[in-house]
């Protein structure tokens, strides 16, 4: 939904199958980017027999190969992955930008030209077991092509794009597997080059 201040009206932009989160306006105000979970199929080892009329059966067993399949407070996590979408600010059909069995988490930020979305996430193959590590990624809105801007053992996060769209400030550290580690402030060019600690 969007609340238009001038008219005081609320407009429904789309009807989505899951809840969108981390909504971000494009620089020209014509598009919204957001993250949303895309369900994947439950694993099944056998097909149960047909339920007899009047039978009161227990729920079928849940089978998972996921490292993190439960969460405190919400219990079992249904299978699926978070992906990025864009939708016209006036409403319409959302278009999925990212794909695959990876979670494209983090609040998307638009590049100054509106051609890319930047996120802080972990898109590596072993992401489930490397939960302390995140990188900053630049994703083409047109093609979904992903470019990794940072690449080290440790989190790179909480980034901000400069007003001229040419640099990115972010915090992070080289993970030394200690219980407490000090985050540092860095800057780099929008293409991931010229990284330096401030």
Language model: regions and residue ranges:
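A flexible loop/linker signature enriched in serine peptidases of the S9 family
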Residues: 1, 15-21, 35-83, 98-105, ...
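Residue-level detection of beta-strand scaffold positions
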Residues: 110-112, 142, 154, 185
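Short loop/turn segments that connect beta-strands within beta-propeller blades
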Residues: 4-8, 88-92, 140-144, 189-193
């Amino acid at each position: 939904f969007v609340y238009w201040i001038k008219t005081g009206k609320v407009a429904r932009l789309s009807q989505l199958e899951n809840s969108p989160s981390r909504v971000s306006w494009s620089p020209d105000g014509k598009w919204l980017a957001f993250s949303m979970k895309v369900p994947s199929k439950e694993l099944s080892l056998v097909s149960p027999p047909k339920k007899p009329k009047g039978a009161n059966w227990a729920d079928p067993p849940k089978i998972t190969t996921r490292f993190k399949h439960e969460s405190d407070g919400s219990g079992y996590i249904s299978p699926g992955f978070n992906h990025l979408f864009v939708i016209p600010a006036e409403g319409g059909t959302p278009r999925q930008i990212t794909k695959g069995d990876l979670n494209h988490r983090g609040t998307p930020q638009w590049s100054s030209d509106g051609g890319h979305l930047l996120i802080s996430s972990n898109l590596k193959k072993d992401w489930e077991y490397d939960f302390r590590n995140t990188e900053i990624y630049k994703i083409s809105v047109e093609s979904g092509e992903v470019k990794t801007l940072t690449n080290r053992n440790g989190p790179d996060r909480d980034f901000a794009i400069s007003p001229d769209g040419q640099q990115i400030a972010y915090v992070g550290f080289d993970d030394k597997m200690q219980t407490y580690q000090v985050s540092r402030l860095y800057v780099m060019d929008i293409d991931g080059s010229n990284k330096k600690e401030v």
